[in-house]
């Protein structure tokens, strides 16, 4: 099929006397699709949680048939009504901030019973959540962002999905999910996969354990699961023309499959960039996950960019201290940054003060000292 010309055809599925016909189209590839420009160290990313940003279309606030049919801006765990149209309407405002890229928390369907606003329990990897808009509206947002000189980074989650995902509710095979679809909690010990003293069991629980009871853990060692996830990301790059991917919970997924994924994407799109969420408190342990890391050798993650969570911690401490000795305040940052020598590519670190999982920096004691 890789050699097939663009065309429309039908896929016919049969089971006994039952038959289902699915119309399908192999689309024409966009010119220069493989030359998509990724984000890099010269870019400033503006993080947006779509449900919390701007409501540009009130008609999609509540979609009949979806499990969470409530909008309540007084409830921090409910949906607030933000959508893709709201973001598109504010692109001039965003561009005028001086940022060069937008990082969107997940926009794919998250049809869960509660807490669906954050998007991290995907129920359909190929569809935008209808409360945000449509696939076409997402593509329009990317095109409009590009017209204003803004890149777009898409959040993806390969470690787990939501338990309302059709792939979990009707598994193609029992080994699509770890522990045969039975809930076993991860330990969240992200240092364990690189720990030379960790037992095989300890490593298995981190990687195969579920993030939560409603987030079943994909078995990426299943070649069909791996192919499904890899192809879905390539489809979004081709379809929408995004400039980057931020991969959630990167250390919780299977190392080899994620390495194959990073390699497959960057071989197809040489200038594309992927950043992994590597939430670990040590720069040495974070460096393990970066492409060509000597710490991980002979294994290679092929992940170009990692998130510098240790630097976030250091900055929150440094700005809450007096710079009056050799260790405190800005001296802390001076010494810490010199340790970036542990990274294979120190110029490919995503630096940030906070994100959607942490308190806002400007509300912390470090930013607002009490006199």
Over which residues does each language-model region extend?
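Hydrophobic faces of well-ordered beta-strands that scaffold small-molecule active sites
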Residues: 44-46, 102-104, 152-154, 245, ...
């Amino acid at each position: 099929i890789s050699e097939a010309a663009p065309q429309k055809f039908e896929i016919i599925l049969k089971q006994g006397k039952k038959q289902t016909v699915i119309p399908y189209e192999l689309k024409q590839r966009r010119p220069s699709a493989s030359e998509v420009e990724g984000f890099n160290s010269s870019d400033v990313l503006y993080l947006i949680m779509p449900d919390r940003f701007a409501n540009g279309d009130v008609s999609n606030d509540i979609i009949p048939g979806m499990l969470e049919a409530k909008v309540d801006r007084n409830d921090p765990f409910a949906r607030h009504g933000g959508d893709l149209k709201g973001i598109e309407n504010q692109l001039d405002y965003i561009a005028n901030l001086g940022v060069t890229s937008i990082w969107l928390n997940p926009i794919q369907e998250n049809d869960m019973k509660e807490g669906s606003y954050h998007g991290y329990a995907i129920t359909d990897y190929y569809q935008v959540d209808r409360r945000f808009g449509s696939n076409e509206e997402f593509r329009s947002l990317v095109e409009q962002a590009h017209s204003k000189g803004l890149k777009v980074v898409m959040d993806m989650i390969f470690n787990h999905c939501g338990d309302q995902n059709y792939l979990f509710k009707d598994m193609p095979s029992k080994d699509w999910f770890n522990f045969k679809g039975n809930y076993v909690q991860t330990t969240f010990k992200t240092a364990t996969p690189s720990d030379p003293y960790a037992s095989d069991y300890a490593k298995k629980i981190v990687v195969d354990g579920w993030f939560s009871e409603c987030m079943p853990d994909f078995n990426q060692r299943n070649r069909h699961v791996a192919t499904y996830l890899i192809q879905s990301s390539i489809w979004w790059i081709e379809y929408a023309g995004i400039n980057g991917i931020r991969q959630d919970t990167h250390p919780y997924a299977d190392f080899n499959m994620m390495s194959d994924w990073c390699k497959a994407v960057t071989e197809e799109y040489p200038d594309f960039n992927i950043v992994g969420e590597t939430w670990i408190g040590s720069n040495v342990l974070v460096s393990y996950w970066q492409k060509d890391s000597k710490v991980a050798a002979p294994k290679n993650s092929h992940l170009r960019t990692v998130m510098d969570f240790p630097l976030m911690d250091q900055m929150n401490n440094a700005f809450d201290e007096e710079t009056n000795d050799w260790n405190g305040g800005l001296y802390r940052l001076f010494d810490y940054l010199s340790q970036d020598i542990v990274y294979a590519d120190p110029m490919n670190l995503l630096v940030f003060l906070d994100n959607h999982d942490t308190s806002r920096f400007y509300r912390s004691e470090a930013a607002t000292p009490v006199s």
